[in-house]
Amino acid sequence: MRTKPLLWLTALALLPVVSAPLAGQPRPVGSEFRVNANTESKQHNPIAAFNAAGSALVVWENDKNGLRGRFYSRDGAPLTAELGLVANQKLTSVPAAGVEVIRKDPAVAFLASGDFLLAWTEERDDVSVDIFIEHRAVIDRDVYLQKFNAAGAAQGAPVRLNATTAGYQSLPKILVRNGADAVVVWQSDGRRVGPSGDGIFSRLVSPATGQPTTVETKLSSVPGLAANPAIAGAANGGFAVAWEAVDGSSQGVFARLFAKSAAPRGAEFRVNSTVQGLQRRPALTADANTGGWLLVWQGQAGSIKDSHVYGQFLGAGGSFIGPQIRVSQGVAQGQVSPSVAAVAGGHFLVTWLDYHDIFPVGLFGVEIDKLGAAVGAEVEINTEAINAHTRTSIAVSPSGGVLVPWEGFTNSQVAPGISARRFEL
């Protein structure tokens, strides 16, 4: 007897397989969404922060219009249109030529009042046009800071933080502390004034006024260029600062601890135990389990395809807790540019960018426990997977939700914009 084909089984086999997040994985809340409304230019370097009420602010740079921002509710709904925070400036009446002031590399931190501090790199470019080709030469870079109210309105004028103006000052980071002045750190490339001008510098800022309360202080002591600073606080008001610097024949990741008064607690020390290749782009977060910190970085032994994300737990006194750990587990692609944040349950979320044949292909993240072990599998953050994504950061809300913004392309745009996605842990 002939039997009919089991067509329904065939159809079932053709259905897409939809997998739920594994236990311990970051759980996405909806798909990625576009943050920037202005698409006339390129958008870069997003950073996000939550206020005490649970609203988020995403800030980024528009290479034509300056620093932009947008507020979101705790549920991810936009609370405002795109805001212009600090505009670029043309210092000449000659069209397409002259000196242009570019605001870039934003850093943002909320105060207890709901106001926030915004720091940035201010770059002056000498712009000229030859036929239809624009030429730019960087004149200088400085670090500025300004206070804003809870609605995003500027409070007072911007203030330059660096006292040393020779060379390039850039890449600020901000730490707001309870019961103490805020700390702003940045890197200085002081090649015009010799090696003493290179390094990581800081200045304390009054949360009430947004004005500096101390002189500029150099934090790094090893001669040579130090770059890409990161900062995270401790429960006692102290803090740690990390950066990358030349370490013999390679590049290493260093850290230094500071008391609540901002006085150093000992000298800087190398964190990475793997010394071959380039160890770069440190990211730092406080560890409530020990009163110390978790430091992650990009470790590269050869080409970018040999890069992975590594980490090291530090105790409250700077001692190593356990050995260096490998956070990212991909083998076919390089993992670079990590970000890290402490989340609920004493765990941590680490994100990074995956590369394949020198092309960025996606953003990934993993939750790890207090010992550095993965809690669940790695998860892809972006949903539009056919275009390049880069420059991710992490913000954690008071209720434990996570917002991850990044710079990248959508399927319908040819210039990079700012996207974001919400997660629960």
Residue spans for each PLM region:
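Bacterial N-terminal signal peptides
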Residues: 8-17
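Sec/Tat signal peptide C-region and signal peptidase I cleavage site
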Residues: 18-24
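Extracellular, repeat-based ectodomains that mediate carbohydrate processing or recognition
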Residues: 24-425
